[in-house]
Swiss-Prot record:
Belongs to the XseA family. GO terms for cellular component: cytoplasm; exodeoxyribonuclease VII complex. Keywords: Cytoplasm, Exonuclease, Hydrolase, Nuclease. Its EC number is 3.1.11.6. The keyword Cytoplasm applies. It is an enzyme of class 3 (hydrolase). It comes from Edwardsiella ictaluri (strain 93-146). Heterooligomer composed of large and small subunits. This is Exodeoxyribonuclease 7 large subunit. The keyword Nuclease applies.
């Protein structure tokens, strides 16, 4: 005979405890997409709110050590993606969620990424008015970078034909939506700059959702627009749509048709200039407001940590930038090597033996002419100096003195007679005249008492 099964009898507290354990063990952590409502942020720093959809709702708590990692400020009515654990509040028998992380869902996440990239590029100066290039007036050729199958191209061509049918237009096809679009837009801008056949570019597309327009919020596209040597007019979506490309471009047009109006010639040129100045003022105002928002954002989130996805995006962007810089450095080195090779060939040709021999022959001829001329001048100078020395020597010769009527008297021992004390009566003297000698004998010596008349020669 079968024994009756004794039923398990629970108390309320044990039941709630068992249910809590089952929920925590079986469910673990889950991801939940829902809308925030009844958000409460008391002074304790914890967050309490309700997550709901159109049919149900559940209470949720997010403690301070978890919500400090949230990179945005949640608000009622906002769609979010929450990672949470399920638990049961045993004393009341209510189950709730304990949130570990939170991020915007759908367009909210894209908007957060948009603001982060905008702040970073703005801090780098890519939005500065000083970098804006003036549009040509009038434009000689217009380039259009957009999809060939979109309505934007049709609108641009229609306006250009209506306003200035003779204006040349070059189309650079590119995808404007999807994963391939940013790369194609970058390559189209680079191609237009390489070919340099247009003096202004229109980059844009028709309207759409934030996700549809996301290619124009790509950092690669923004940097390509900033690096363009050709002025760029952005024309993305409708007037209410704002993209990163609008901030970086030299001028923002609210629609592709408006962009065609701006770049084409019109009878009323003043209107185009007025629109240009208005756009510059709008850009300056947007820049000022963006800086204010950035400052407010910094003050609001200075204790919050950066989201890992943003950090990963920056690393990926840096990797792409380094890759581009490496390619540019390699190209530069190749060009420098080619230039050095050409210069080396020219130097080698200049240093060839035939070239050196011709230079030496020419130099030798120059030296020969210089030597001959210098030798002639030297001989003439030496002849002149020789004549002068001969004249001086002749003037200083004793024979010349004798020829003027003077004489030289010597004693018999050859000593020249200068004073009367050198002789005595009876000494023999020799006097040298111009044409010979005279010998005489001293009979007496007398001192000079008076000056003798000029022309009288003395005698011993």
């Amino acid at each position: 005979m079968t024994q009756p099964v004794t039923p398990t009898i629970f108390t309320v507290s044990r039941l709630n405890q068992t249910v809590r354990q089952l929920l925590e063990l079986e469910m673990g952590q889950i991801w939940l997409s829902a809308e925030i409502s009844n958000l409460s942020q008391p002074a304790s720093g914890h967050w309490y709110f309700t997550l709901k959809d159109d049919k149900a709702q559940v209470r949720c708590a997010m403690f301070r050590n978890s919500n400090r990692r949230v990179t945005f400020r949640p608000q009622n009515g906002q769609q979010v993606l929450v990672r949470a654990s399920i638990t049961l509040y045993e004393s009341r028998g209510d189950y709730q969620l304990i949130a570990e992380s939170m991020q915007p869902a759908g367009d909210g996440l894209l908007q957060q990424q948009f603001e982060a990239l905008k702040q970073r590029l703005q801090a780098e100066g890519l939005f500065d008015v000083g970098h804006k290039q003036p549009l040509p007036s009038p434009a000689r050729c217009v380039g259009v970078i957009t999809s060939t199958s979109g309505a934007a191209l049709h609108d641009v061509l229609h306006v250009l034909r209506r306003r200035d049918p003779a204006l040349p237009v070059v189309i650079y096809p590119s995808a404007v939506q999807g994963g391939e679009a940013p790369g194609q837009l970058v390559r189209a801008i680079a191609l237009a700059n390489l070919r340099a056949e247009c003096d202004v570019l229109i980059v844009g597309r028709g309207g759409g959702s934030l996700e549809d327009l996301w290619s124009f919020n790509d950092e690669r596209v923004a940097r390509a627009i900033f690096a363009s040597h050709i002025p760029i007019v952005s024309a993305v979506g409708h007037e209410t749509d704002v993209s990163i490309a609008d901030f970086v471009a030299d001028l923002r047009a609210p629609t592709p048709s408006a962009a065609a109006e701006v770049v084409s010639r019109n009878r009323d040129e003043l209107l185009r200039r007025l629109l240009s100045q208005r756009q510059r003022l709008d850009m300056a105002l947007d820049y000022t407001l963006a800086r204010r928002r950035q400052r407010l954002q910094q003050l609001r989130h200075r204790l919050e940590q950066q989201h890992p996805q943003l950090r990963l995006a920056r690393q990926q962007a840096r990797l792409l930038s380094l890759h581009r810089r490496l390619e540019e450095a390699i190209d530069t080195q190749l060009r420098l090597a080619e230039r050095r090779w050409r210069l080396g060939g020219e130097r080698l040709q200049q240093r060839s033996p035939a070239h050196a021999l011709r230079q030496q022959q020419y130099h030798l001829q120059q030296l020969s002419h210089r030597l001959e001329s210098q030798l002639q001048r030297s001989v003439a100078a030496r002849r002149e100096r020789f004549g002068a020395l001969c004249s001086r020597l002749e003037g200083m010769s004793p024979l010349a003195t004798l020829a003027r009527g003077f004489s030289v008297t010597q004693r018999d021992d050859g000593q020249l007679l200068r004073h009367r004390e050198q002789v005595a009566p009876g000494d023999t003297l020799r006097t040298r005249l111009e044409d010979g000698w005279v010998e005489s004998q001293v009979t007496a010596t007398r001192p000079l008492t008076a000056r003798r008349p000029r022309g009288t020669k003395g005698s011993a």
